[in-house]
């Protein structure tokens, strides 16, 4: 987000109550998606920096915020930007940023870069690779579906047919271990083991 700290000055911007800022609010979803797309590799180390620049400023100007009415002077003990890097077994690495407020164009990007090709996922799926001696760019035409509806249908299918859910508790724990390591690294100012 460019400028849009949710619930500024309330519980949502209190580390003691919310646990963290944009990494826990929006970054977790991109981390989880990246992990899912790469088969949930085993994380080894994490390195991060976090910044608290805008939320406490009296002259903070924003584009829009949801949640409660902003309370200037209220608690702001979370980051408004976290930049991280995670190393995984098998030579996989992940770079991520999560922001509520920064001086940049708003963006939501997920790129997977591999030796045989690359995927750009947002806002539309694109594949980049090589076929024979030619570089190829492919934009597949996919049926548009509602992610929320698909999630609910999968959830109901798991209950009705006693199937294992695509997203498991173990995967959630792995994602949370990475987030905890990113926050620890930012606090200590060095790379840490996950």
Annotated model-derived regions:
Residues 31, 78-82, 176:
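Conserved glycosyltransferase catalytic-site signature
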Residues 25, 150, 167:
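Residue-level signal for the nucleotide or nucleotide-sugar donor/cofactor binding architecture
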Residues 89, 133, 155-194:
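C-terminal helix-rich "cap/oligomerization" subdomain common to oxidoreductases
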Residues 57, 71-151:
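NAD(P)-dinucleotide binding in Rossmann-like oxidoreductases
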Residues 30-31, 149-153, 179-180:
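A general structural signal for well-ordered alpha-helical segments in protein cores
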Residues 37-41, 118-122, 182-185:
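Phosphate/oxyanion-binding loops and surfaces in catalytic or ligand/nucleic-acid-binding neighborhoods
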């Amino acid at each position: 987000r460019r400028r849009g700290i949710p619930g500024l000055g309330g519980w949502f911007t209190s580390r003691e109550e919310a646990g963290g800022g944009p990494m826990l609010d929006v970054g977790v979803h991109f981390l989880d998606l990246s992990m899912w797309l790469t088969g949930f590799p085993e994380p080894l180390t994490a390195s991060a920096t976090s910044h608290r620049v805008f939320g406490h400023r009296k002259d903070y100007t924003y584009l829009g915020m949801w949640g409660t009415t902003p309370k200037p002077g209220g608690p702001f003990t979370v980051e408004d930007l976290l930049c991280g890097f995670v190393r995984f077994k098998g030579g996989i690495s992940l770079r991520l940023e999560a922001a509520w407020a920064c001086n940049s164009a708003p963006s939501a990007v997920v790129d997977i870069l591999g030796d045989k090709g690359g995927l750009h996922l947002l806002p539309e799926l694109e594949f980049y690779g090589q076929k024979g001696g030619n570089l190829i760019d492919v934009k597949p035409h996919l049926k548009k579906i509602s992610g929320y509806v698909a999630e609910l249908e999968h959830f109901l299918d798991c209950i009705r047919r006693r199937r294992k859910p695509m997203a498991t508790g173990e995967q959630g724990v792995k994602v949370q271990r990475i987030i905890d390591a990113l926050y620890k690294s930012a606090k200590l100012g060095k790379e840490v083991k996950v």
